[in-house]
Amino acid sequence: MNRDSSRQSAIILAVIGILPVVWLGLLIAPSVKGGLPEILPSLLAVFNDPFHIELCGDSLKTVLVLLLLYGMGIGIYLSTRRNYRRREEHGSAKWGSAKAIDKKYRQSPPSENKLMTQNVRIGLNAKKHRRNLNTLVCGGSGAGKTRFYCKPNLMQTSNSSQVILDPKGEILRDVGNLLEKAGYEIKVLDLISMEKSHCYNPFVYLRNDNDIQRLVTNLFKSTTPKGSQSNDPFWDTAASMLLLALIFYLHYEAPEEEQNFAMVMEMLRAAAIEDEEDNRPSPLDNLFADLEMDNPDHIALKYYRSYHSGSAKTLKSIQITLAARLEKFNLESLAALTSADELDLASMGEKKTALFALIPDNDSSFNFLVSILYTQLFQQLFYSADHIHGGSLPIPVHFLMDEFANVSLPDDFDKILSVMRS
């Protein structure tokens, strides 16, 4: 019961108490003239015959005096009902105990908790304890971040989906079978042995033009080496316009099986300028010329015109810049991995799924794909929660980002952390 309702109940009881006070005043009124010696004996007679009331000249005065005394008593009582902390004038801080903290935050059943230490758990339903479930675990190499935090929490097999960043594939090897037996659907983005990986095609998750813009921005950010600064951002900006034109074309004009990065590379090769003096249009120019005849206001055409406004030498340099950004997609293994999609990211908030992202610990060449995966996964889960499930996902999604410093995260990751908890 909160403070307001408690005070309201006390006032109601005080008002009800007026009736017996008035009744008592009427009973003792005939004896008040004789003072206390007459009042006390009369009380015995009053209780023997409580309904024998005689009205007299002192009845009104007696009732008013008793009501005044009663009101003063109630006022003193209500004014002293405060949360006094006696003998704590100099503070009340003390060392907490693991048992007390665990009792305060744990929930039932035990599997529906996040393990903080061996003796302390915190429930996954944040609405009950009103605490943030985001956890930062710091420690040097060999401190036990994976062994004593990641693995025990995965072995809880709670009613939640798991997204695990797994350098070397150690976590998948140790707990994958356990999760599968617990009813999890296991999906793996394996950038160590790509031929064993589930396929992941970022194009599948492009719902609108804004998603395409985010994909291109994230791709350029995640393929930029840390700490590097371009003296002339023109080339990256122009290359991003060309990439936007290609992706917009595929998104709106190509069949689904051709919407992937392998086809982007095919289109880029079709734009190659062999001779700067040759003014003949390239196959890609012809493709966009046909598009202009059908739909001159097509968004892909707008970006292509912006890219194509330079000289042949400039266009060739822009193509080289973009080819350098996308050169990993020339590899057959990566092209095959991104040619289709088997991850179904949106379903992670609807059924128990464990998604492992395996990255080499000694090579960050393909980590940009994990960065794109995280960005699109956040977008898919937010959209599903807000537009399909009324604000929250049926199945909570728990991110375990082991060695996450090795992956380029979205620029607004701190904001995502602050809002995803709800």
Q: What are these language model-derived features?
A:
Residues 1-143, 147-153, 195:
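Basic- and hydrophobic-enriched, low-structure N-terminal and domain-boundary segments
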